[in-house]
Amino acid sequence: MVVGAIPFDARRPGVLYRPVRVVVEQAPSPGAVVAPTGRLDVIGQSPDPDGYRRIVRKAVTAIRSGAMDKVVLGRCATVEVSHASEVWRPEDVLARLRASNPDAYVFRLDLDGGMGGLFDEPGILLGASPELVLSCSDSRIWTLPLAGTIARGTDPASDIRAARALLSSGKDLAEHAHVSRAVVEALGRHVDDIEMPSGPQLVATPVVWHLGTPIEGVLREGRSPLELLYDLHPTPAVCGWPSTPARDFIARCEGFDRGLFAGLIGWMDVNGDCEWALVLRAGVLHADRATMFAGAGIVAASDPASELRETATKMMTFTSALGELVDPPVIGLQIPDPPTANAVGRPTPAASRRPH
């Protein structure tokens, strides 16, 4: 078995381990998790909010000219804390992530550094990913591409309105169609008996609604799950479509090296059974600071301010495990209280919640 992470640029070396011992057990209930009381100071952003809006406008121009259909643009924020040192205990941050995101793929990976950019120093990668790229068991595969996002409401009525708005949003439905179509094309080169719903479903996290399409099938005889994984990655959910111009645009304009952000994290055994999720809703923890990442899918109808707010909303998954930011422009909005009820319902596609 190997466990670890593969970078966004899969041509680069990953962080993979062959464990001496593997323990598989039900994750313990997080119980009562004390909220952090420290205040976080912003010490860096790449790009800053104004810069992010500029590159979104540039991307929209490129898309409307026919250079590509979609590109996912990310940004990073680095924060430090001068009080409440318990915020930086990785086990506490992990417990908060698990408590707040019980349906996510919650992960921790200790890093030795030396990867350059944001991952050049030793640190701890932590996150709560909502997105399954590939799960395989006895040649049956599952995937759950997500694209199209809206912030959750702060009360049941506004939460219902948000969910309905997402399901009827032409911009988000078009963005999701690019992703699901590309995933199905990749699966078709490796998989038979593909099954999927006729349209996207709502997938909930504590802070956002996503559009998701659960897809499953049977791995073709003689095909490798690893080959399929590398054919899928990076999906248009974190890169864009077509992949080559989107990747080139990201390299030219985003302004930082993603490293493991928007990469893959998971495991694979000797039989090819595996489970790999995207490195999203994540950050790297150091002794005195943390760096988090979020991105948004840009299409022809994208509005720069709305896309900035989307990255802000997504960062809230990680910031809520650390503390509240002092500088609101970093995340773009204050952290709201979660909805007290979910009247719409919370679809949990089999692709994302298959038991092992």
Can you annotate each of these PLM segments?
Residues V3-I6, V71, Y105-L109, R258-G266:
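A short glycine-rich, hydrophobically flanked beta-strand micro-motif that places a catalytic Asp/Glu
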Residues C239-P245, F249-H356:
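Glycine-rich, small/acidic residue-mixed loop/short-helix segments
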